[in-house]
């Protein structure tokens, strides 16, 4: 018996539409979140399920980690795709997804943390043989 596959798209607009189309091509069901201001966006009509996560202010909706996790629980999804911006580069959110039993569809929280530290990231890239732009490699004093 095939396991049902379902993801939550935690973004809006063209980012959500592109992710939704790709997920559908891969055979996934899709739940999408939205703020009250975004209730008529196209990706919601294309989704299998749409869940309101808060008011228009993105700090209270698309950046509300608890609301996104609750929506994922409500929709009974396997993973959460943050898209771009909002929570996509938030290492703590990626870890919360994992700890809540959801696959964070993106880099691991460890990689997000590492790449957020530009000195450590540049050192790692050098170790891996990736060309880096020459320049100062230490912390900048203010």
Where are the model-predicted features located?
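N-terminal beta-alpha lobe that positions the nucleotide/phosphoryl donor
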Residues: 1-142
């Amino acid at each position: 018996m095939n396991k049902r596959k379902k993801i939550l798209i935690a973004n809006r607009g063209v980012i959500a539409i592109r992710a939704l189309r790709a997920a559908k091509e891969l055979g996934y069901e899709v739940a999408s979140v939205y703020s009250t201001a975004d209730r008529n966006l196209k990706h919601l009509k294309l989704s299998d399920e749409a869940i309101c996560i808060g008011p228009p202010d993105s700090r209270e909706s698309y950046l509300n980690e608890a609301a996104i996790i609750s929506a994922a629980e409500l929709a009974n999804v396997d993973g959460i795709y943050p898209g771009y911006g909002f929570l996509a580069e938030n290492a703590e959110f990626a870890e919360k997804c994992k700890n809540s039993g959801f696959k964070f569809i993106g880099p691991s929280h460890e990689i997000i943390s590492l790449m957020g530290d530009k000195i450590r990231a540049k050192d790692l890239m050098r170790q891996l043989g990736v060309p880096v732009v020459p320049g100062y490699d230490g912390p900048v004093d203010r």
